[in-house]
Curated annotation (Swiss-Prot), chain A:
It comes from Drosophila ananassae (Fruit fly). Component of the cap-binding complex (CBC), which binds co-transcriptionally to the 5' cap of pre-mRNAs and is involved in various processes such as pre-mRNA splicing and RNA-mediated gene silencing (RNAi). The CBC complex is involved in miRNA-mediated RNA interference via its interaction with Ars2 and is required for primary microRNAs (miRNAs) processing. Also involved in innate immunity via the short interfering RNAs (siRNAs) processing machinery by restricting the viral RNA production. Residues 9-23 have a biased composition (Basic and acidic residues). It comes from the Eukaryota. GO terms for biological process: mRNA cis splicing, via spliceosome; negative regulation of viral genome replication; primary miRNA processing; regulatory ncRNA-mediated post-transcriptional gene silencing; siRNA processing. Component of the nuclear cap-binding complex (CBC), a heterodimer composed of Cbp80 and Cbp20 that interacts with m7GpppG-capped RNA. Interacts with Ars2. SUPFAM superfamilies: RNA-binding domain, RBD. Residues 1-23 are annotated as: Disordered. Residues 30-108 form the RRM domain. MRNA binds at Y10, Y33, R102, V103, D104, W105, D106, R113, Q114, Y115, G116, R117, Q123, V124. This is Nuclear cap-binding protein subunit 2. One of its GO terms (cellular component) is presynaptic cytosol. Belongs to the RRM NCBP2 family. Pfam families: RRM_1.
Length: 154, 783
């Protein structure tokens, strides 16, 4: 039977190493990826929520590669596996800033990973989205270019 | 024996029974066991799964499950007896509320396989003894419940069960004062033995009363024991202090009264099928069985290292309560209330780590009892465990996440029960123990954050006259420290920490806005050029921000300044924090860059207090920054934990002691001492971490800081006059004293080892009475 602390099916394609090495690091990791955050959610809010599972070692906010502003994800590292597991169990799928946030294991933060990997600088998912999401810059980047090509140059 | 089960039929004649009578002709098997023989390993594994499933409410008939299991055993597992018994033991230990189902399974096997019955009885009696020897008291409670149910399933004889119960109670038999037994055997042990017997009586009392003349004597022993014992811990462990409308009772007193009432009703079968009796469906079959005699138990005696389950006080908020849908909560003294709670507690205990699964099980359980307000009871049990004193079994967020999940699943039921519960707690806040205050605030802010902070704030604000959001510099007016005022203030601040200032201004009604402090911006006082130190701050700012100066250059600027040393530290601190004020990450980056400068500047206590003063000044309006930055300074080893303690208890922070963040900081400070591996530098191997934390030095340091904290509590309380009830000073003293108790509770394992030191402190001459009482009650409870 699956539990809340099992590895999800997502694998970071940029991981340097074999699939089994990747899974081993995920299994030993004390770092979490946190996704579906609002662009406006601050590090302080994340700290408040995640420190309820244990002492947070470090939070790395995900930033737009070009604008250097938050782009809706972050990494949270704890001191122990048990604390990280608590966050997987009790925070994943609950609300922060009125959004259901996603918490998943991460193999550990490496410099450069704090930046969005999309062409426009943010996360890839925000380029292809077709819905309107006020917390993540409105429509997806591609769609909003089509809708209003002249107003997106601010 | 034949009439036994026929007679007991009148306990209940349920639909399930009817179903059984009809079913045999078109029985649907749950298992393909007769079709295919399984290999040994698979069979044992399948058996384990099926046994666990006996404790799950899923609509399948219990009788069918039991029959299948016994067929499955006979077909596949005759050669794996030891494995089967081990699985059985782990099930009865984990699921004491389902002991009757497991006993029925054994009862069914015992009919065709007397040898299995005999082995099971001996195995369990052995397990009972070893679990007691190993201080696994909860385990032995489960085994005991199971053995008692074996009697109901006609597996063991009445006389031998009575002997076992008598053996358990032998230490509870009244002893003359000064008698050796009462001196040696602690009350916790006798309480537990009495509890073990008492908790089995609802399911077995009627039969024993009819069958055994000695049962009356047993009840009398229990009665005398419970009535004569003095539950000293009750006052300390009760969440509500005297004067609250919520009745709360010591767990053993309460259980006795519930059982006594049941006896007075001639052991009337509890309503709503709260007692499972699956064996009734098999009474004809079971009545043909031969019984075993339980081997006499050689009770392991008390030793120096024996540790017993702590006493509890039962948490109640829904007394004499009629739920909005007209369903009546079982009365407090009814055995139904006890059984309902026990079953909910068991689901929580087994599934608490998986909030979704746990919610499913709780919802299914509620569904199976449509005529009872189970939802209210679930909320009461969860809140009760979460607020439990001295500490709760799991972290607050665990309980909160389950309640959020339940609320999503049953939006028409759970949120209403949470609301009613919260309203009742809010109304009783004055008498709530300070030691569970933070848990309540943390839970509630998180719960609200999951539902858009939607709450009847206005109603809560009405009764609360207390004034503004406190600033340490402000004078405070009467009513500011009133419990409800403090609660609302802290709750709203915590909500803001999970959200943001503007949102809170939109969520809160007009009459509550005064509880919201001003936006939590930094306050950089050196912007005013007339303030001493402003010139130095300009130089530093320009160097750090303008040209990202190296630490050496900053040191040179500081050396060149003619300002006083402590002022320099203050300026340096505030400039760094001001530059990094955008976020924690920015702050940490600046502090790390100039770490060496700080290390050169800061050594003594007063120098360390100067940097702390800088933090508290710049972030006067932002408690979270104060707490996180100071914790970081300890981790960076710029500030020492012991000086953070002396800072917190310094006279200028008196008002701050009424706020939650300062205690958050104090706990975090203790944790840095407990886990020295978490101090920078960063990465350490797991082996180094373990070695560091197990060092004797660490234990000495932890003892040192915890003792220092108690000393500071005593001192700060001794220096305050309490004032008349209702005054700010009175509230302040009660609150700080409650915080001291919280420290004793949270670190009770450590404080236990410092018994003699605590005794010494409590004997000092100029102590406040409340302080002495708190320490003495703690010592009595733990020793």
């Amino acid at each position: 039977m699956s539990t809340s602390v099992d590895l999800s099916s997502y694998r970071d394609q940029h991981f340097k190493g074999s699939r089994s090495e990747q899974e081993r690091s995920l299994r030993d990791s004390t770092t979490l990826y946190v996704g579906n955050l609002s662009f406006y959610t601050t590090e302080e809010q994340i700290h408040e929520l995640f420190s309820r599972c244990g002492d947070v070692r470090v939070i790395v906010m995900g930033l737009d590669k070009y604008k250097k502003t938050p782009c809706g994800f972050c990494f949270v590292e704890y001191y122990t596996r048990a604390e990280a597991e608590a966050a997987m169990r009790f925070v994943n799928g609950t609300r922060l800033d009125d959004r259901l946030i996603r918490v998943d294991w991460d193999a550990g933060f490496i410099e450069g990973r704090q930046y969005g990997r999309g062409k426009t600088g943010g996360q890839v998912r925000d380029e292809y989205r077709t819905d309107y999401d006020a917390g993540r810059g409105g429509y997806g980047k591609l769609l909003s270019q089509k809708i209003a090509p002249n107003t997106d140059n601010r | 024996m034949g009439d036994r089960y026929r007679r007991t039929r009148d306990y209940s004649s349920t639909d399930d029974d009817m179903e059984l009578m009809i079913r045999p002709t078109k029985r649907r098997r749950l298992l393909p066991s007769r079709v295919k023989m399984l290999d040994n390993e698979t069979a044992v594994e399948t058996f384990g799964r099926l046994m666990k499933a006996l404790s799950i409410q899923n609509g399948c008939s219990m009788e069918l499950k039991l029959e299948d299991l016994s067929y499955f055993y006979n077909d596949n597992l005759e050669d794996s007896k030891q494995a089967v018994l081990r699985i059985l033991a782990s099930c009865v230990i984990d699921h004491p509320a389902h002991a009757s189902a497991y006993a029925t399974f054994v009862g069914l096997l015992n009919i065709g396989n007397f040898q299995f019955g005999a082995e099971c009885v001996h195995f369990m009696m052995h397990k009972l003894r070893t679990s007691m020897e190993d201080n696994q008291w909860k385990n032995s409670h489960g085994i005991m419940a199971f053995i008692v149910e074996l009697f109901n399933c006609n597996v063991v004889t009445c006389n031998s069960l009575i002997s076992l119960l008598t053996c358990f109670l032998s230490e509870c038999v009244e002893v003359e004062e000064g008698d050796e037994v009462s001196d040696i055997v602690p009350q916790a042990r006798r309480d537990w033995l009495a509890f073990c017997v008492l908790s089995t009586l609802p399911s077995v009392g009627k039969e024993l009363q009819q069958k055994s003349a000695s049962f009356q004597g047993l009840l009398l022993t229990l009665q005398i024991y419970v009535k004569k014992r003095i539950p000293l811990h009750a006052a300390m462990l009760g969440i509500w202090n005297g004067g609250s409308g919520c009745a709360q009772m010591d767990y053993l007193d309460l259980l006795w009264q519930q059982v006594e009432r049941l006896r007075d009703q001639q052991w009337l079968e509890p309503e709503h099928q709260l007692l499972q009796r699956p064996y009734l469906a098999f009474d004809d079959t079971l009545s043909a069985a031969l019984q075993h005699v339980l081997p006499p138990l050689k009770m392991p005696s008390h030793t120096q290292i024996s540790a017993y389950p702590p006493a509890r006080v039962v948490f109640r908020i829904f007394d004499f309560f009629t739920c909005p849908d007209g369903l009546q909560m079982p009365p407090v003294l009814s055995v139904e209330r006890h059984l309902l709670e026990v079953q909910i507690q068991e689901i929580l205990k087994v599934h608490h780590l998986e909030r979704k699964l746990c919610s499913d099980h709780l919802c299914n359980y509620a569904k199976s009892k449509p005529l009872m307000p189970v939802h209210f009871c679930i909320v009461e049990v969860i809140l009760g465990e979460m607020l439990q004193l001295p500490t709760s079994p799991w972290i607050t967020l665990n309980y909160g996440s389950i309640l959020v999940e339940l609320s999503k699943r049953q939006p028409d039921k759970i949120p209403m029960a949470v609301m009613q519960g919260a309203d009742i707690i809010y109304a009783q806040l004055e008498s709530m123990s300070v030691a569970c205050f933070d848990r309540l605030v943390n839970f509630f802010s998180h719960y609200l954050s999951n539902f858009g902070f939607n709450w009847h704030w206005g109603q809560w604000g009405k009764g609360c006259t207390g004034a503004s959001a406190l600033n340490s510099s402000q004078m405070f007016s009467s009513g500011d420290f009133q419990t409800k005022t403090v609660f609302l203030r802290e709750l709203i601040k915590k909500c803001r920490r999970l959200s943001y200032h503007l949102n809170m201004t939109q969520v809160l009604p007009e009459n509550m806005l005064h509880f919201l402090p001003p936006p939590p911006h930094p306050q950089f006082k050196y912007i005013d050029e007339l303030v001493p130190g402003a010139k130095l701050s300009q130089l530093l700012l320009e160097a750090m921000r303008g040209r990202r100066a190296e630490p050496t250059e900053i040191s040179t600027i500081l050396t060149g300044s003619t300002d006083l040393h402590l002022l320099k530290i203050n300026v340096m601190t505030q400039v760094c924090l001001h530059i990094g004020s955008k976020s924690f990450t920015h702050t940490f980056a600046t502090l790390t860059r100039y770490q060496t400068v700080f290390k050169q500047l800061i050594h003594s206590e007063s120098e360390q207090h100067a940097i702390l003063k800088g933090v508290f000044e710049l972030w006067a309006g932002n408690e979270q920054f104060k707490y996180v930055v100071v914790e970081k300074l300890i981790r960076m080893q710029i500030v020492e934990a012991k000086y953070v303690v002396t800072w917190i208890f310094a006279p200028q922070l008196r008002v701050e002691l009424t706020k939650m963040y300062i205690w958050e900081l104090l706990h975090a400070t203790v944790r840095t001492v407990k886990h020295p591996s978490r101090l920078l530098p960063r990465k350490r191997s797991p082996e180094t971490v373990k070695a560091l934390e197990e060092m004797d030095d660490t234990e000495v340091a932890v003892k040192g800081i915890l003792l220092e904290i108690i000393h500071r509590f005593v001192k700060v309380l001794a220096g305050s006059t309490e004032g008349p009830e209702g005054s700010n000073t009175h509230y302040w003293c009660q609150w700080v004293q409650g915080r001291m108790q919280e420290f004793l509770f949270v670190y009770s394992e450590d404080y236990k080892k410092m018994g003699t030191k605590l005794v010494k402190i409590s004997e000092e001459s100029d102590l406040r009475k409340g302080v002495i009482k708190t320490i003495q009650a703690f010592l009595a409870y733990t020793m």
